[in-house]
Each structure stands twice: as C-alpha cells, then as structure tokens.
Amino acid sequence: MLETETGRYSDTLRSALVSLDGDNAWALSESWCGTIQWICPSPYRPHHGRKNWFLGIGRFTADEQEQSDAIRYETLRSSGPGGQHVNKTDSAVRATHLASGISVKVQSERSQHANKRLARLLIAWKLEQQQQENSAALKSQRRMFHHQIERGNPRRTFTGMAFIEG
C-alpha cells in the first residue's frame, strides 16, 4: 500500500493507493477496475436505510521517468558588461539535461567552472519542480476519481459483512 486516506470512522479508509507488479498485474487490475457494489447494512450507520454501497476502483500509472545525470555543456561568450574578459573568454555555459530536454544558460560568474556548477544546481532544481508538478497532477486526477464513481452497473458485487462475491 503506497498511500491511504483515512475515513470518517475508525479503522476505515476513504481511499487507498496500492501498487501491483508482476506478470499478471495488468490482468488483475483489469478484472477489478470499475464500480464494485457492496450489499450490506452499514455497520457504522446502523439506522440508515441504504444497503447498497459503491466503491470505485481505477488504475493509475506512475510517472516513472528515470532521470539520468547526463548533462551536455556548451560554452559560449557572455554578454553584457565585463570588458576584455567577456570579449575574449568563453565563460558562459548552456547546460542541457539530455533525458528531459531542460536547458539553462548561466553567465553570472566570471569562471566557466563556477557557471557549470550553477547550471547543474539550476537543472537539479528544475527537475525537482517538474517532478512535484507531475506528482500534484496525478494526485489531483486520483482525487477527481472519487467524484466520478458510477452508481450502478457494477463490475463485481459483494454481499454481507464477510464481503462474499456473488
């Protein structure tokens, strides 16, 4: 279990994120995706008249971008003030992260080595920002899934507190 969101009552879950892997993981998830109906009076709301409860099960693929550390550096002349030093040395650096295509240009320092170090730090920061954005988008997609549960037309039906399929 990768992530859980606790329910309103003790020992309940509002949401759970489970990871499956192996040869039959896709087929197993396919057999469960959709609406699951549970027919049973609620143990948490005994006087409630409803006995049909619906659960939504969906498949979400993780964004598994393997980020390599391969960075291509290009040196070029800086622009702006600096006199003869700027005009004669290639101290500016354009760094490109090969896996993601993120590119930065750094010319704030006088030395090429210092600019390379800053470029590496900038790329690392941008990669972290990109990963956080992707994670937030996936979390938002899972949150919206809660509101899209189809009540009716269940893929599987279970009855009773023992959760017996039938």
Swiss-Prot record:
SUPFAM superfamilies: Release factor. InterPro entries: Pep_chain_release_fac_I (IPR000352), Pep_chain_release_fac_I_sf (IPR045853), PrfH (IPR017509), Prokaryotic/Mito_RF (IPR050057). GO terms for molecular function: translation release factor activity. It comes from the Bacteria. Could be involved in translational termination. Belongs to the prokaryotic/mitochondrial release factor family. This is Putative peptide chain release factor homolog. It comes from Escherichia coli (strain K12).
